[in-house]
């Protein structure tokens, strides 16, 4: 565990501080958590801001059978493992919807505005993922989370 980061998950609560963090990551999918893991390992104060659930789109999948090293688990479980990995290295997770970002060139700081307050950060990584498009065939919803 890094000396700079505390193993903290806000789980819906956000502790405001006037002190900027090193990295704010918008999005808690695989890319967001991969970024958080690398940033925390580099001893950077790191916060993942996610509006939904850990894992992003993969969390809606019933069964994941093609993740290397793990034969079978649910998408929600995989998302939870992403979160636990990042938190175990010191990243903080905040459950909130980002509403905007401002940059102050004089201070060289970003302000990430979200439902739980503002986060000041030296850098921002946007990992906002994708939204699946419906294919448009009859009965499509029946297969959602299984093979679509």
Task: Pin down the residues of each PLM region.
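Glycine-rich FAD pyrophosphate-binding loop
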Residues: 41-60
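Short glycine/serine/threonine-rich phosphate/pyrophosphate-binding segments
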Residues: 30-35, 145
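N-terminal Rossmann-like dinucleotide/flavin-binding domain of flavoprotein oxidoreductases
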Residues: 59-118
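Glycine-rich Rossmann-fold phosphate-binding loop(s) that bind the pyrophosphate
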Residues: 27-30, 51
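FAD-binding core/adjacent interface of flavoenzyme oxidoreductases
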Residues: 2-26, 42, 47, 93-148
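Gly/Ala-rich phosphate-binding loop of Rossmann-like dinucleotide-binding domains
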Residues: 36, 40
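Glycine-centered loop/turn positions within well-structured domains
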Residues: 56, 65, 133
């Amino acid at each position: 565990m890094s000396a700079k980061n505390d193993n903290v998950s806000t789980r819906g609560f956000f502790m405001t501080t006037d002190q900027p963090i090193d990295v704010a990551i918008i999005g808690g999918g695989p890319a967001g958590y991969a970024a958080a893991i690398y940033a925390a390992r580099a001893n950077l104060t790191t916060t993942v801001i996610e509006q939904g659930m850990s894992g992003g789109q993969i969390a809606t999948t019933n069964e994941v059978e093609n993740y290397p090293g793990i034969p079978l688990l649910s998408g929600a479980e995989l998302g939870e493992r992403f979160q636990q990995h990042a938190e175990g290295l010191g990243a903080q997770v905040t459950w909130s919807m980002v509403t905007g970002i401002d940059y102050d060139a004089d201070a060289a700081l970003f302000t990430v505005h979200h439902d739980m307050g503002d986060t000041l950060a030296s850098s921002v990584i946007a990992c906002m993922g994708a939204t699946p498009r419906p294919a448009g065939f009859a009965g499509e919803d029946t297969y959602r989370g299984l093979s679509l």
